Amino acid sequence: MTEIRNNWTKEEIAEIYHTPLLDLVYRAATVHRENKDYAEVQISSLISIKTGGCPEDCAYCPQAARYNTGVDVHGMLPKEEVIAAAEKAKAGGASRLCMGAAWREVRDNRDFDKVIDMVKAVNALDMEVCCTLGMLNEAQAQRLADAGLYAYNHNLDTSEDDYKRIITTRTYDDRLQTLEHVRKAKITVCSGGIIGLGETVEDRISMLKTLSNLPKHPESVPINALVPVKGTPLANQPSVSVWDMVRMIATTRIIMPKTVVRLSAGRTEMSTVEQAFCFMAGANSLFAGEKLLTTPNPSFDTDMAMFDLLGLTPRKAFKNGRPQQEIMETETIL
């Protein structure tokens, strides 16, 4: 087993990131096989339970109210629609449902009550439940935990130095504080970032340093490639190279060997061969289904065909226990 470290330096991470690509993939694949069943990949499904109208100014996001992106704004979905989506996702091979709401932060109101009911209902389907709802306080995190929430997603997006170029309506420390509240409630942490925002390689390395130097590594780190959306400030950003994705995934796998590395947004632009490189580099989770909130994504059928071709198997839910059980870091997976 690989040693778990929480004291990585930027210089060490940079040296890993800049390793010749094939050597980097080989090293990451070796670490992956030492710590995980390399052929086992968790399938997650992501749905938007409240879309658009967000007061924040995230430069990449089509759900920000201040941008004219043509997003179909809607309020909270009925619980019945969420259950139906969860059942469809489970039938397609997903073991986790992530519910996203376009909020700046959680508020103690009827909508949050509805989220609690949704968490309980999806949990009853024997699926892991994840939420991404913006900032939340300790009491709200505990309420979600009591309802059976397995994971909470709150991405850092980019480095602390680059952050204000992308978002001004909440601080980097706000994000880190939310992660602390999630951890204190014994909910597993999902936090990663986006490449292709116009950041530098140093920004990518700095973000990975922040994540890997948390008191406990996130159980899941999503690596997203920007999907430019017309109407947002980043609409004209050039597409990021798939090899940059491979480097990010491989570096993440090496410095956080027991963390699940999720191949997230941007897969529609990747061939099966390119995605295979991502799995070789240590990715062991993906989002399946036609949409990731508001952006396109490969279908369940397409992904199942890829799994068959590559010899991958979907991971079952709750392999390491239910949300409120103490999860061993040596076996934790999202």
List each model region and its residues.
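Glycine- and other small-residue-rich loops at beta-strand/loop junctions that grip anionic moieties
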Residues: 47, 133, 171, 193-196, ...
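Hydrophobic faces of well-ordered beta-strands that scaffold small-molecule active sites
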Residues: 41-45, 97, 129-131, 152-154, ...
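N-terminal pre-triad scaffold of radical SAM enzymes
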Residues: 26-67, 74-100
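Auxiliary Fe-S-binding modules of radical SAM enzymes
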Residues: 1-39, 84, 212-334
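Conserved Radical SAM active-site core
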Residues: 65-192, 197-213
